[in-house]
Amino acid sequence: MNKKQLKIVTGVAIAVLIISIIPMLWISQYLHPFADDYVFGAEVYKIWNETHSFPACVQTAWNVAMTMYHTWQGTYSACFLMALQPGVFGQYWLGTFILIFSLVTSTYTLLYMVMRKLLHSSRLEYLFVSTLFVLMTIQFTWSYYDAFYWYNGAMYYTLFYSMSLFLASLLIGYQLSSSKFKKALIGGASIVLSIIIAGGNFVSGLGMGAILFAAILIMKMEQRKWPRLYITILTIYGIAFLFSVLAPGNAFRQVTIESKPNVVVAFFMAIGKSFEFLSESINIAQILMLMLLSPTLVKAASSSRFKFSHPWLCILITVTLYSSFFFAHSYAMGTRGPGRVQNIYSYLHLW
């Protein structure tokens, strides 16, 4: 496509994206809390109605998170946010706005860092690719209800996935920054965000840890030195993630599972289930949209400074990293997980 055609197609894509999101937001006014929304939000709801003090609600939400840590699940930051769900303040519809906004902005942000900062694509090319990518991410979501409308389940996966994209954007920004002040600011924000993500779901938790580890090894091979910030973040992330995994509540919860595969079986099961999911999720609409994107992506890749002397190794690493997101549920339950979990897989497979 020439520049004029690309401009027209990009404009149409942006219009379609906006039009497609409007009804998704509109129906949020009819939502109400459901299931675990009540379990996690009851105490905060009580405090809010008694005091109308937001700081008191924050303290109560943390108390709920710590109670859950010792009795049911160790995902401390997720439980904290679950307890603070908008429904306790009478604004349950706000959850849909937060979830869609976070998914859209995080995807645009990471693609901006990749296309504009790393690949040096034009602004128009970036808008074209990122808009279609966001459109596919939203419209090809595995379970819409679990992704945008049930706060407890959606926040646990969609929001933490979005946080992971923001963290990736920050880490790229750190590498590209030459200002010590900016590096310190980005580094601090990255550490805080990594601690929050580590206290979220185990699907994103394991996958993000694997990506960080792979990034460190690749940067060591390319730059001939260890990336100190990345190692620091992975270390802090690992400690925080272990704090979540080793929670007493997880042991109580695991007792409810009658049987599960061992680590080795779960590893190969995760790889198998990743291919199984891809075979079920990729459809003709996605293929056509990827074909539409391919000329722009090929142009960006061919003009970049990045070289892939071992493409098969690159594919192997990519498949392994993608499969790492399937490991948590394969090991814990021997399945791909419910719809809210599979939303993560549907977001990721586009990358």
Language model feature labels by segment:
Residues E125-Q175, N201, S323-W351:
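Membrane-interface micro-motifs in multi-pass membrane enzymes
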Residues M1-I22:
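Start-transfer (signal-anchor) and selected internal transmembrane alpha helices
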Residues G173-I195, I231:
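Short hydrophobic alpha-helices at membrane interfaces in multi-pass membrane enzymes
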Residues M66, G90-S106, F133, T137, ...:
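Individual alpha-helical transmembrane segments in multi-pass integral membrane proteins
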Residues S102-Y108, Y161-G173, G207-A215, I284-T296, ...:
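Hydrophobic cores of alpha-helical transmembrane segments in multi-pass inner/ER membrane proteins
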Residues I27-F89, W93-T96, Y151, A198, ...:
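Transmembrane catalytic cores of multi-pass membrane glycosyltransferases
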Residues I100-L124, F166:
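Transmembrane-helix motifs of polytopic, lipid-linked glycan transferases
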Residues V114-S122, Q175-S179, E222, R305, ...:
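Membrane-interfacial segments
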